[in-house]
Amino acid sequence: MKLNKWLTSTKFIVSLYIGVIILLIFFLYKIVVYENFEDTIVVSNLDSSAGFYSMFFFTLNHYIYCKRNKIGFRIKSDNWLFKSSIGWTDYFEPVELTFHNNPTNEQSALHSTVLGDYPIRDYQMVIKNLYKYNANTKNEILNAYSKLNLVKGNYDSIFIRRGDKLGKESVIIPEENYMDALLEKNPRCKTIYLQTDDYTCYLNLVKYIKQNNLGVVIHTLCDENSVGVVVHGFQKDILNDASINNDANKDYLSSIIQKLNDTKPVEDMNSVEKYKHTMDMIVGIDLVIHSNICITDYQSNVSRFIKLAHDHPKNVYNIDDLNNDIDYDKIICPSYSF
């Protein structure tokens, strides 16, 4: 009996000792790789594993880390899901940090790799350092403002993301809830831009506005045939299951599931289709972040990006909690949540 206790105790101590050694090696590895080498450059890899703004938040993390520690930084987007021709510079200006001449030690940082733990406000402060439109993107954005006759700050906005998010990440919120919340925050609202991937949201809001004589004009750039974006093909299996078993979303999903099944995933689009899809998204998001007041939810990376990138972040409201702002001092990568 005593022997068994001794063996158990010894095994526990040995396991604990090994665990400490592994953690120490990992910690020292990070120090050696990223902090002690003046010739190191961190390469933030944009790949095909996740959505646009999920990857963007992790790239922001890599950028913050490099900027603080004076380490070289650049973006690699050869295999990026949203690459049309070149990659990042299809839509944005190139981004690079250089602190030392001719760095030779490249260290790759992938999606979901967190190099340092930072508060949300740190991410907010550097968004504009990376999110810099190239000339073509600027022109597309100007054309959109002209087409819709919108002036920055003189209209309100609503953002609703559906599509593949309804499989398991998001819960359907009735469109009228967003409208009511917006009118609560701005009773004088007369013009709204709706950014959504599901045209049904637009139709339902138009109907609600007419039925209640709200006297509000609503615009959208959403394709009238779209019932939601599907990023990866495997998400269709999740959506089909949710259309039967997801109590919160199944009623709506079951009514559009065939259209979702017919929707081409972003990963299967050709270069022309990817460019249009991505440019339309960037343009629409720009219209939102330069609105007066925005009502959204924080269930998606896009909406969390909108909160942080908006001209007046305090004017971006979470439909689930209109009276409380986020904690900007919370240490978390926004790709996970607020």
Feature annotation, model-predicted:
Residues 1-43, 150-151, 333-338:
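Intrinsically disordered, compositionally biased terminal peptides
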Residues 39-42, 78-189, 199:
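Secretory-pathway luminal glycosyltransferase catalytic domains
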Residues 43, 62, 66, 71-101, ...:
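PAPS-dependent sulfotransferase catalytic core
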Residues 48-57, 167-169:
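A short, glycine/small-residue-rich beta-strand->loop->alpha-helix junction that serves as a flexible
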Residues 52-65, 284, 291, 297:
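Conserved beta-strand->loop/alpha-helix structural units within folded catalytic cores of enzymes
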Residues 56-68, 175-185:
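Histidine-anchored nucleotide/phosphate-binding helix
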Residues 191-319:
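Donor-binding and catalytic core of enzymes assembling or modifying cell-surface/extracellular glycoconjugates
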Residues 321-338:
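Leloir-type glycosyltransferase catalytic cores
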